[in-house]
Regions:
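Conserved active-site tyrosine of GNAT-family acetyltransferases
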Residues: 17-22, 77, 105
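Vicinal oxygen chelate
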Residues: 74, 80-119
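Short beta-strand micro-motifs in enzyme catalytic cores
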Residues: 37, 61-63, 94-98
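N-terminal beta-strand motif that seeds the catalytic metal site of vicinal oxygen chelate
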Residues: 1-18, 45, 61-63, 114-119
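Mid-chain, well-packed structural core segment of small domains
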Residues: 63-81
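Short glycine/proline-centered loop/turn elements that form peptide/ligand docking sites
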Residues: 16, 33-37, 90, 117-118
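Short secondary-structure junctions
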Residues: 26-31, 84-88
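Conserved short beta-strand elements that form part of the metal-binding/catalytic scaffold
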Residues: 28-61, 107-113
Length: 119
């Protein structure tokens, strides 16, 4: 395996979600079609898929996006309309994680982890 490449969130309104994620992550999509929107976030792909019917948002699989300032990133997501899922919490050493729900109910994880370095 080569490592994680893409995290996909299903949304009911692709246009509004594209606008929201553009503001939330500070990047514009590199691929924008009615069937898929893709963002390059620090070399990893965040994808948006339009919901094709009933979708259940579960908490059993999480992706955490790396940040340098967990509280600032958390506050920014909340100010853009995300809702609290788990407040920033120290999980050992200097590692801090938090999760929010986007306006479509998807769980977004953020992590400050100075011990993990990209290759």
């Amino acid at each position: 395996m080569l490592g994680l490449r893409t995290t996909i969130y299903k949304v009911s309104d692709l246009g509004k979600a594209t606008e929201w994620y553009t503001r939330a992550f500070g990047v514009k999509p590199y691929f924008n079609e009615p069937f898929y929107v893709g963002f390059n976030v620090g070399g990893y792909e965040l994808g948006l898929l339009p919901e094709g019917g009933e979708t259940t948002s579960a908490d059993n699989v999480l992706s955490y996006w790396g940040v340098t300032d967990i509280q600032k990133s958390y506050d920014t997501l909340i100010s853009l309309g995300a809702t609290e899922h788990e407040k920033p919490t120290n999980v050992g050493g200097e590692i801090v994680t938090a999760t929010v729900r986007d306006p479509w109910g998807n769980v977004i994880g953020i992590i400050f982890n100075p011990e993990f370095k990209l290759p």
